Design a protein with these regions (language model features):
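Carbohydrate-binding surface patches
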Residues: 75-130, 134, 177-183
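Aromatic/acidic polysaccharide-binding cleft in carbohydrate-active enzymes
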Residues: 1-99
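Generic detection of short hydrophobic beta-strand segments and adjacent strand-loop junctions
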Residues: 71, 100-107, 114, 157-168, ...
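Short, charged low-complexity linker/loop segments at the C-terminal edge of domains
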Residues: 68-70, 126, 187-192
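Substrate-binding clefts and catalytic carboxylate motifs of secreted carbohydrate-active enzymes
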Residues: 9, 16-31, 110-148, 153
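C-terminal beta-strand-rich structural cap/linker in extracellular carbohydrate-active enzymes
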Residues: 139-192
Length: 192
């Protein structure tokens, strides 16, 4: 029907960005997701009636990565640090119906090789309801079609490594109803 589960998932991420520090439950949600899913199997929980993860399930997977010390937060972002790893989650709701340029600037980094990973979830990547609609919204799904949706309904993932000394800046675009997690972690750090 007309229910936009990706937009709902992005609103949940926005709520977490605004309430970080007051809501301690979110890092544990994905671990206990079975208890959050509807027991009736009607698809009203985090999984579809066929057991496919909805966009909200994927959001909880990204939020689960936000362990650590809160560095900064705003209405559409949250930044945390866990050891030498820095994670910044951005969310762009459909109320802001334009692509927004977002940047992460990390300073005080030790010289070394770092791994930069991005996870992107939105209507074009990771949203099972959007994929289902583009398949033609069949009344029944074959095993192959279910496997295809399960495989494709994952956040887009990108990894790069580079040598950094002192400061690093990452810049990208966040589209409407999209959630973006940027993670900077040391691959090798010089300790002197």
């Amino acid at each position: 029907t007309g229910w936009d589960t990706c937009a709902d998932a992005c609103k949940i991420a926005g709520f977490v960005c605004r309430t970080a520090g007051r809501v301690a439950l979110f890092p544990q949600l994905r671990d206990g997701a079975d208890s959050l899913n509807s027991g009736s199997g009607d698809g009203t929980g985090l999984l579809t009636a066929g057991g496919l993860p909805k966009a909200v399930w994927q959001v909880f997977g990204l939020l689960h990565r936000l362990n650590g010390t809160l560095l900064a937060q705003g209405d559409t972002y949250i930044a945390v640090r866990e050891g030498h790893t820095i994670r910044v989650l951005f969310c762009q709701t459909s109320a802001n119906a334009v692509q927004t340029q977002v940047s992460v600037i990390c300073t005080g980094l030790r010289r070394g090789r770092y791994r930069i990973r991005t996870f992107r979830l939105g209507p074009s990547c990771g949203c099972v309801s959007t994929l289902f609609q583009t398949m033609g919204a069949p009344e029944r799904l074959s095993q192959d079609e279910q496997q295809y949706l399960r495989r494709m309904a994952q956040p887009r993932y990108h990894v790069q490594e580079q040598t950094i000394s002192g400061q690093y800046q990452w810049t990208g675009l966040c589209s409407p109803d999209e959630i973006l997690l940027v993670e900077l972690s040391p691959a090798e750090i010089e300790m002197f």
